């Protein structure tokens, strides 16, 4: 089960098969040109993620304006001395020459490309939920909050209580 959870394509397939909503996936790009083409039709942007793993390792939140050829990418990846590292810090990139090798490295993992769905807000921060369950029982829920679009807690983001959400009832 753990291996299935770390395989993003397989996890999405299982969740969908059990009538749970998942972030819409786009066709997987295999080159930087295909990525730019896919992003041209995605006004909110997309997340390019390695197929396997967790903890924001290797993800890229990407926005692209094709008319201006303008890129904005948020990622934990950084290329240092021709080696790509997961820095556990979010970097903002705008130069195609910096973005291209990172995106190609992620695509070589059998990446997935997801539509960027805006997150709800709680007290001025974006949030999402990390839900852990076994069988049909929810074990716990963590509300993950961030000023940006990437909410993973190991990136110095904030955890909040479920009871702080305006939609929850005691």
Which residues make up each language-model segment?
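Residues at the C-termini of beta-strands that transition into short coil/loop
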Residues: 26-29, 63, 142
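ATP-grasp fold ATP-binding core
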Residues: 11-17, 39-63, 73-75, 103-121
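ATP-dependent carboxylate/phosphate-activation module, predominantly the ATP-grasp catalytic core
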Residues: 65-170
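Conserved N-proximal alpha/beta basic substrate-recognition cap immediately N-terminal to
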Residues: 1-41, 54
């Amino acid at each position: 089960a753990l291996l299935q959870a770390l395989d993003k394509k397989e996890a999405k397939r299982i969740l969908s098969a059990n009538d749970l909503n998942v972030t819409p996936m786009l066709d997987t790009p295999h080159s930087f040109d295909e990525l730019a083409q896919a992003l041209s039709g995605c006004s909110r942007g997309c997340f390019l993620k390695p197929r396997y793993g967790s903890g924001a390792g290797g993800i890229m939140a990407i926005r692209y304006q094709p008319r201006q050829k303008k890129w904005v990418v948020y990622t934990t990846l950084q290329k240092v001395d021709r080696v790509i590292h997961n820095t556990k810090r979010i970097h903002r990139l705008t130069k195609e020459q910096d973005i291209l090798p990172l995106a190609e490295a992620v695509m070589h993992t059998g990446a997935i490309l997801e539509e960027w769905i805006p997150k709800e807000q709680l007290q001025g921060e974006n949030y999402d939920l990390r839900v852990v369950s076994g069988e049909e029982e929810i074990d716990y829920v963590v509300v993950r909050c961030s000023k940006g679009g990437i909410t993973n807690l190991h990136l110095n983001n904030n955890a909040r209580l479920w009871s702080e959400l305006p939609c929850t009832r005691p």
